[in-house]
């Protein structure tokens, strides 16, 4: 098999395709051998296994979404690098004899940094249990390998869409034979020449045949109950990772750390909210604007542009105050074309320009002058109140 895959390799840029599939086959081979007596109860073996095939940030995601069973809600489990050895150890501590991946329609892609992405759209996980029970979970597999320096799994994801449970033919034959030998003579009652079977005998036969077959080791999701429980607990602990790290850093009790953690989250949320509120917007709408400036303030230029069809009315004292602030004799660069015709010039709020010369810019009123050559182009009395200028 290795030779066949080696012959399929070809050079594509800086990466040679085929290494990702080979590494996945090595992973599958060592995963199947976990039931051996020397490794079954050794969690150290699984720690070495995870260290050899996963990066320190590697994860295993198991998604369950049965389209044919709408009553079963979708589930998503994510196992981190630290939880993977315990997961594999518990899997083989039960009735499981062998666990392996079956790949179908496998594709491999080279990614930057000498990595590989392997995808199998018709993949399956094969579980073989003691007693002759076999469970096949079908789904979709995605594997992302990262070279560090050997190829290791940065993420392994399996999306289950259904499962099937199988029994050995030998078990079915033995159960049928035992049932036929233990069956009492047919309890038939004859009434007027018509034979009728006892209805209770059919239910007894069904119960007897079910008792002779081994029990199902998996639940409705195709997982063993204790493995399902472990994955649920791990998912909960993974969501509390920040709280656990905060508790260890504070060296306080659970209750005190929980209150401090909630306070820290609130402060962080308030800081983010205040930071986002200080970001200027291009055309903000004034709060409480109903057609006139609030509290007699001078309307902003952005508000005038936004409500140009209905220019705001201004009190007389505001207009006189604006007239005192704006001395039109000191604004030679004023271009009234940028203002709405229906809005008085006095309603434009003052703003000041920074005393920085604009390189290569000419005044629209004096075309021939260059501000770099004329030191009096921006006089000190012109920097108090300026109008917007078209350039």
Curated annotation (Swiss-Prot):
Entry's family note: Belongs to the adn1/SEU family.
Disulfide bonds: none
Keywords linked to the UniProt accession: Cell adhesion, Nucleus, Transcription, Transcription regulation
Main location: nucleus
Composition-biased stretches (Polar residues): 180-190, 370-383
Name of the protein this chain belongs to: Adhesion defective protein 1
InterPro entries per record: LIM-bd/SEUSS
């Amino acid at each position: 098999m290795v030779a066949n895959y080696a012959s399929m390799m070809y050079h594509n840029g800086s990466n040679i395709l085929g290494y990702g599939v080979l590494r996945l086959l090595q992973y599958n081979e060592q995963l199947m051998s976990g039931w051996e007596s020397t490794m079954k109860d050794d969690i150290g073996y699984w720690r070495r296994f995870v260290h050899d095939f996963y990066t320190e940030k590697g994860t295993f995601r198991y998604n369950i979404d049965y389209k044919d069973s709408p009553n079963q809600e979708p589930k998503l489990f994510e196992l981190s690098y630290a939880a993977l050895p315990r997961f594999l150890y518990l899997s083989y501590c039960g009735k499981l004899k062998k666990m392996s991946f079956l790949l179908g329609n496998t594709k491999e892609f080279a990614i930057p940094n000498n990595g590989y992405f392997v995808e199998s759209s018709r993949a399956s996980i094969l579980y073989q249990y003691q007693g002759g029970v076999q469970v096949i979970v079908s789904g979709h597999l995605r594997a992302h390998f990262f070279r560090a320096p050997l190829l290791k799994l940065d993420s392994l994801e399996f999306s289950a869409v259904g499962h099937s449970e199988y029994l050995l033919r030998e078990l079915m034959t033995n159960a049928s034979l035992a049932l036929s030998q233990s069956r009492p003579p047919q309890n038939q009652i004859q009434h007027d020449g018509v034979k009728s079977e006892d209805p209770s005998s059919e239910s007894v036969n069904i119960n007897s045949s079910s008792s002779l077959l081994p029990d199902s080791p998996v639940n409705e999701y195709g997982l063993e109950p204790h493995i399902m429980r472990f994955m649920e607990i791990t998912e909960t602990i993974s969501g509390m990772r920040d709280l656990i790290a905060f508790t260890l850093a504070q060296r306080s009790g659970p209750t005190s750390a929980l209150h401090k953690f909630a306070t820290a989250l609130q402060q962080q949320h308030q800081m983010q909210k205040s930071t986002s509120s200080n970001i200027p917007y291009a055309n903000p709408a004034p709060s409480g604007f109903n057609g006139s400036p609030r509290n007699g303030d001078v309307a902003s230029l952005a508000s005038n542009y936004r409500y140009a069809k209905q220019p705001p009315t201004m009190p007389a004292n505001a207009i006189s105050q604006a007239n005192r602030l704006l001395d039109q004799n000191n604004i030679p660069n004023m271009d009234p074309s940028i203002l709405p015709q229906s809005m008085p010039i006095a309603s434009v709020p003052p703003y000041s320009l920074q005393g920085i010369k604009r390189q290569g810019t000419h005044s629209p009123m004096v075309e021939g002058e260059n501000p770099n050559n004329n030191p009096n182009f921006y006089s000190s009395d012109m920097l108090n109140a300026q109008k917007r200028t078209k350039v």
